[in-house]
């Protein structure tokens, strides 16, 4: 089963050494705002990525939660530990919001 977390729980993973937060949205959306520390890997390019660390929990978020579930499912199949954010970035109202390229 895919582990899901609420958008509020996303703050728990920010800044942790054992987690990698991945923003699956388009580059333009990421540039406008994103969760602090998140790396931008647009969903369309994710399938070809072979360089993601096996020793970290991959925390995926997208716009509303659909793509992140699909990504989490795929990477669990590859042997990773994953989390998918329910409701995606749209639901996130946490304190780790970054606007622009800060």
Can you annotate each of these PLM segments?
Residues 1-20, 27-57, 63-102:
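Rhodanese-like catalytic fold shared by cysteine-dependent sulfurtransferases
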């Amino acid at each position: 089963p895919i582990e899901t977390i609420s958008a509020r729980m996303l703050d728990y993973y920010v800044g942790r050494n054992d987690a990698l937060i991945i923003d699956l949205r388009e580059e333009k959306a990421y540039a406008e705002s994103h969760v602090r520390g998140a790396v931008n890997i647009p969903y369309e390019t994710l399938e070809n990525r072979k360089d993601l660390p096996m020793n970290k929990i991959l925390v995926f978020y997208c716009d509303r939660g659909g793509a992140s579930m699909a990504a989490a499912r795929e990477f669990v199949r590859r042997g990773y530990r994953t989390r998918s954010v329910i409701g995606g970035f749209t639901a996130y109202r946490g304190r780790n919001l970054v606007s622009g390229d800060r």
